[in-house]
Structure formats: structure tokens, C-alpha cells
From Swiss-Prot:
The gene is ZNF189. InterPro entries: KRAB (IPR001909), KRAB_dom_sf (IPR036051), Krueppel_C2H2_ZnFinger (IPR050826), Znf_C2H2_sf (IPR036236), Znf_C2H2_type (IPR013087). Keywords: DNA-binding, Isopeptide bond, Metal-binding, Nucleus, Repeat, Transcription, Transcription regulation, Ubl conjugation, Zinc, Zinc-finger. GO terms for biological process: regulation of transcription by RNA polymerase II. A zinc finger (C2H2-type) spans 148-170, 176-198, 204-226, 232-254, 260-282, 288-310, 316-338, 344-366, 372-394, 400-422, 456-478, 484-506, 512-534, 540-562, 568-590, 599-621. There is a cross-link at residues 67, 88, 160, 434, 452 (Glycyl lysine isopeptide (Lys-Gly) (interchain with G-Cter in SUMO2)). SMART domains: KRAB, ZnF_C2H2. Belongs to the krueppel C2H2-type zinc-finger protein family. It comes from Homo sapiens. It comes from the Eukaryota. Residues 14-89 form the KRAB domain. This is Zinc finger protein 189. GO terms for molecular function: DNA-binding transcription factor activity, RNA polymerase II-specific; RNA polymerase II cis-regulatory region sequence-specific DNA binding; zinc ion binding.
Length: 626
């Protein structure tokens, strides 16, 4: 009886090799026993699925007995270093109907080829018998052949199983579900990796540092930290990376691509992580919490930097002097001391600085900006450190303590000056890079810090100063320089403090408030004078008649009654006056057309439209004469 001819091969039927996974010798050695067991189970499951779905390329009349007939995968290491992995399924006892499926993973260790590609004369007798008696043996598909092509995106695949997996990207199919949380995945391997979240299993351990991972690919990437391997190189700049995704992100620098867009403000980012961090500015989310002080941060990097305050860690060390810093930015700024680099240039005066913060503070000299205001008294400052020092006046805080006698000071300069009592040091150095003269500061306080010594001399008039900044300001009297310009009216000033006071004319700002009556002033000196009304203090006394005044200007004007001095002279009629306001009122006579009779004071020359106003005015002269 003739043997029945094999049925024609149906279109779309699979061989077991279509869904088989092949390992190289190196990959197989890397797997632990549990992983090899998993591999065996998956291969058996795949074969069982093919048989149960009736898509296997075999006789339809044959009934598989998968459970009993699939033998264990045997792992035999041949003398030639070849892995032997078999799966056998005996269909029935009929020799013509018997079909043995064997997943042959025999790889030559040196050349990486399959068993059937080795010349027959090079095989052992056992290997020749195995190859010749195997009914279905197919070569591993050529890595260049990609016969399975995706109609959606055109991507090609060598294996049909990979092609099927890829199609789920387009269809969104996720047939593999987690029993714990119900989350579904497109691949069974993804489920296995995901389930380790629930079990806490981390089977992949680093041989270098002992760190464990739940996914093998994460371990491979991690080990590149130890080996220094960077297999992914940029074609544009030749920079290499340890991870492919890092290369993809890097290439956006060259292409300018920013695919991640913020839905709130429209700002785009090249990296998704940057978008996530940016979105926290809208949501206010701060998911990273410090376990020491409960402070929270929007970025993990900020938390890491903050935690060094508690640990005292200073990982960034200067190669020149050995000084260590908590942040890399601090180290970069410090290194400019050694290099002398000053990349930040002021466009107004050309002065350069090593830090951008120094430039910003300097530019406030030109703009007159004083953004730091004291909530207690309203005084404002151009630098935060100056405000901090000033606030100690209100709080009474004296953080600088003398180790010799225990006396405390609110400023470090006060402590330094005091310590010279103990050391008998008689010199008074001044660090101009740390502190600068503030016109609003008490001159008495500054003279206590820098007593007597005035080493800065003006070449024009010989006047000396204890601080170089004071000399620079003084020299503008001789040069006429007025570098501080009002942007509103164009008026210029020799000092930034003068500009600030002037700008309050435009803004109407009156930051100095009297606590007694609530009256406010644009200048601190006016507030001090006003407060004399409440205190009744009149420190300025006339030596001639004993009359006292709350202001020095009032005393000077009064003394002209005794001396007869009239320094204010009218250019029209040569008449002179003891007070400037009297001259101003007098000049109105020349400037305005007389439409009515005016009444002029014989004592000072001030004119009035009403006679009663003149009489009231003359009472001032008679009161002063008493």
C-alpha cells in the first residue's frame, strides 16, 4: 500500500520555529536556572497553543498528546561548547504519521552557527544521527530577511511572532492581564515583569555592586555605569551614550525637535521629563519630600541637593585648592576665582563680574532699584544681605559673638573692630567686595566701625575719607558726573540714593511712616525732622538769644536776624533776602504782570496780594525779635 502523500501546505500555517526564541551561547550562560526553567515553560506553552489553535503545519487528523509527549528540555553541553535544547512531541506510533518537533538551539560557541550548518564530517556520530533523524529542521531565518511587513508603518520583521507583537501597537490589543490589579499588556513578558511590582521580586543582581533589578534590561543598562560602555553614538557630534533613549533625546539638540507641549501655556520641550517638571509650576505639585525637615520639592534633583544640608555632604571638590561644595554650581562659581574669569559684563559701564548675581546687584546702581524692603520701617535695600543686617536693628539679633569676652554684635564688621581691642591691632582694613557705603546708614555707626583713619584723599581739594566709595561719590562734585538717570524725566544725579528719592516724585511713594500721627514722607530725613514735633525735642539752640529749633536749617535762618546776612539776591533789582523762599516770592513781582495792588514786607521783601496776609506775616518778624 502506497504511502499517503502529505497534504498541501495551507496558507498562513506556522511552524514551531516561527514562535521559537533563540539564544546565543553568551545569552544562555547569562540565564539563571529559574530563567531557563521559565524559557522551557514558555516554549512548551507556545507549542501547545499552536496545536490547540490548529494553526500548526501538520496533518489535521493527528491528535496531539501535548501534556505527556512534550519531553523536558535537555541542556547538554557538548565538548565543542554547543547548547542542545530539544522539545519532542510524539504524535502517534505510526512511522508515517510520527512527527518530532525539535527546537534545536545548537550554536557553535566560536562561530555562532546552527548544528545543521556544521559540515557533516565535523560532527560526532550522535550529532549526525540526531540531524539525519529529525523530520523537520529549518535554518534560522537570515537576520537580513524581513519577510513580515507591517501594512500600517512599513516596518519589517524576521519572525512572525515579532510581527504579531508589533501589530498590537497599532490595534491597541492587550491580551495579557495581571491577576492582581487587572492591568493589561500587549506581551506576556510585560506581564511577568509587571507582576514583580506586586511580589517585590528582583531576580537580576549586579555582579559589581550587588544592586538588584526586576527587569534584565535595566540591569544591562546599569552595568554600563561600571564598565563605562557607551554603545550609542551621535552621528552629528560623535558623543556617545549608554542608553539608546539618551541618544534619541540628545539628537533633538541638533534637530531642534520639541515634541512635548504643555497644554496650559503652550511651552514645548524636547524631553518629556522636562514637561512633567514644568507642569508642576501650574499645579503647584511638590512630590519629593525631605524626611528630615518635611520640606517638599518639585524635582528630585532639588531634594537631593537639599538633603546635603542635613548630611553635610560636599561632593564637588575644587582641584586647585581642595575646597568642597554642596552644589556643582557653587564649585563652578568658585573656580572663577582661580581662573580670573568674569564673563558677565555690565552694558552701562563695562564692568565685569564672575557671577550673574553680582552683575544683577551692580546694575541696581544704574537703575536705582531697591527691591528688598523692611516691613518694620519701610527702608529699602538693593541687596538682600543688607536688608538682613538692617533687620537686626529691629529684632536685636546679634549673631557675631566674641570668643574672648562674649560680647555680641549684629554685624561681622563690628566684631572684627572689637576684636582689635584684644589683639591690639591698629589697622582698619575694609573689604570693598563685601560691603558698600549706604547713604541712608548712620554716619555715626560707620565712623565707629572705621574710626579716625582716612586714607582716601581727594586730589582736587585735599579732603580725606575712610572709605573709597565715599571718595568716589565726592569726586563727582568736581567732575560733575551724574551717572544715575531718571527714565521718566531724564534728570540725572551723582548718587543712586538721590535718584531713588527723586523717583518718588513720579511714583508718589512715601515709604517712611510716622507711627504717632500716620503722616508719611518720601525721605527718611523728613520723617526724623517731623518726629521732633511729637517729641518736642529742639536740639538746635541760638547762642545769641537762646531760642531753640527742631531743625538746624531753622537755626541758620534765625541767626541771620542777628547777623543781618541776606545771601539771596534778586538779579532784577539787586534786592537781597535772608531766606530763599522770600527771594522766590519776590521774583514773582518781576515775572508776573501786576493786575492788583501788592503789599510788600519791609523786613524781608516778601509780597502779598492781601494786606491781612502781610500783617500776619509781619507777626513772625516781631515774634522772632522778642
Amino acid at each position: 500500500m502506497a504511502s499517503p502523500s502529505p497534504p498541501p501546505e495551507s496558507k498562513g500555517l506556522l511552524t514551531f520555529e516561527d514562535v521559537a526564541v533563540f539564544f546565543t551561547q553568551e545569552e544562555w550562560d547569562y540565564l539563571d536556572p529559574a530563567q531557563r526553567s521559565l524559557y522551557k515553560d514558555v516554549m512548551m506553552e507556545n507549542y501547545g497553543n499552536l496545536v490547540s489553535l490548529d494553526v500548526l503545519n501538520r496533518d489535521k487528523d493527528e491528535e496531539p498528546t501535548v501534556k505527556q509527549e512534550i519531553e523536558e528540555i535537555e541542556e547538554e553541553v557538548e565538548p565543542q561548547g554547543v547548547i542542545v535544547t530539544r522539545i519532542k512531541s510524539e504524535i502517534d506510533q505510526d512511522p508515517m504519521g510520527r512527527e518530532t518537533f525539535e527546537l534545536v538551539g545548537r550554536l557553535d560557541k566560536q562561530r555562532g552557527i546552527f548544528l545543521w550548518e556544521i559540515p557533516r564530517e565535523s560532527l560526532t556520530q550522535e550529532q549526525r544521527m540526531f540531524r539525519e533523524n529529525t523530520n523537520i529542521i529549518r535554518k534560522r531565518p537570515n537576520s537580513e530577511e524581513k519577510c513580515h511587513k507591517c501594512e500600517e508603518c512599513g516596518k519589517g520583521f524576521v519572525r512572525k511572532a515579532h510581527f504579531i507583537q508589533h501589530q498590537r501597537v497599532h490595534t491597541g490589543e492587550k491580551p495579557f492581564q495581571c491577576n492582581e490589579c487587572g492591568k493589561s499588556f500587549s506581551r506576556s513578558s510585560f506581564v511577568i515583569e509587571h507582576q514583580r511590582i506586586h511580589t517585590g521580586e528582583r531576580p537580576y543582581e549586579c555582579n559589581y555592586c550587588g544592586k538588584t533589578f526586576s527587569v534584565s534590561s535595566t540591569l544591562i543598562r546599569h552595568q554600563r555605569i561600571h564598565t563605562g560602555e557607551r554603545p550609542y553614538q551621535c552621528n552629528q557630534c560623535k558623543q556617545s551614550f549608554s542608553q539608546r533613549r539618551s541618544l534619541v533625546k540628545h539628537q533633538r539638540i541638533h534637530t531642534g525637535e520639541k515634541p512635548h507641549k504643555c497644554s496650559d501655556c503652550g511651552k514645548a520641550f524636547s524631553w518629556k521629563s522636562h514637561l512633567i517638571e514644568h507642569q508642576r509650576t501650574h499645579t503647584g505639585e511638590k512630590p519629593y519630600h525631605c524626611t528630615k525637615c518635611k520640606k517638599s520639592f518639585s524635582r528630585n534633583s532639588l531634594l537631593v541637593e537639599h538633603q546635603r544640608i542635613h548630611t553635610g555632604e560636599r561632593p564637588h571638590k575644587c582641584g586647585e585648592c581642595g575646597k568642597a561644595f554642596r552644589l556643582s554650581t557653587y564649585l563652578i562659581q568658585h573656580q572663577k576665582i582661580h581662573t580670573g574669569e568674569k564673563p558677565f559684563l555690565c552694558i552701562e559701564c563695562g564692568k565685569s563680574f564672575s557671577r550673574s548675581s553680582f552683575l544683577i546687584e551692580h546694575q541696581r546702581i544704574h537703575t536705582g532699584e531697591r527691591p528688598y524692603q523692611c516691613k518694620e520701617c519701610g527702608k529699602s535695600f538693593s541687596q538682600l544681605c543688607n536688608l538682613t543686617r538692617h533687620q537686626r536693628i529691629h529684632t536685636g539679633d546679634k549673631p557675631h559673638k566674641c570668643e574672648e569676652c562674649g560680647k555680641a554684635f549684629s554685624r561681622s564688621s563690628g566684631l572684627i573692630q572689637h576684636q582689635r581691642i584684644h589683639t591690639r591691632e591698629k589697622t582698619y582694613p575694609y573689604n570693598e567686595t563685601k560691603e558698600s557705603f549706604d547713604p541712608n546708614c548712620s554716619l555715626v555707626i560707620q565712623q565707629e566701625v572705621y574710626p579716625k583713619e582716612k586714607s582716601y584723599k581727594c586730589d582736587e581739594c585735599g579732603k580725606t575719607f575712610s572709605v573709597s566709595a565715599h571718595l568716589v561719590q565726592h569726586q563727582r562734585i568736581h567732575t560733575g558726573e551724574k551717572p544715575y538717570l531718571c527714565t521718566v524725566c531724564g534728570k540725572s544725579f551723582s548718587r543712586s540714593s538721590f535718584l531713588i528719592e527723586h523717583q518718588r516724585i513720579h511714583t508718589g511713594e512715601r515709604p517712611y511712616l510716622c507711627r504717632q500721627c500716620g503722616k508719611s514722607f518720601s525721605q527718611l530725613c523728613n520723617l526724623i525732622r517731623h518726629q521732633g514735633v511729637h517729641t518736642g525735642n529742639k536740639p538746635h539752640k541760638c547762642d545769641e538769644c537762646g531760642k531753640a529749633f527742631s531743625r538746624n536749617s531753622g537755626l541758620i535762618q534765625h541767626q541771620r536776624i542777628h547777623t543781618g546776612e541776606k545771601p539771596y539776591k534778586c538779579e532784577k533789582c539787586d534786592k537781597s533776602f535772608s531766606q530763599q523762599r522770600s527771594l522766590v516770592n519776590h521774583q514773582k513781582i518781576h515775572a508776573e504782570v501786576k493786575t492788583q495792588e501788592t503789599h510788600e514786607c519791609d523786613a524781608c521783601g516778601e509780597a502779598f496780594n492781601c494786606r491781612i496776609s502781610l500783617i500776619q506775616h509781619q507777626k513772625l518778624h516781631t515774634a522772632w525779635m522778642q
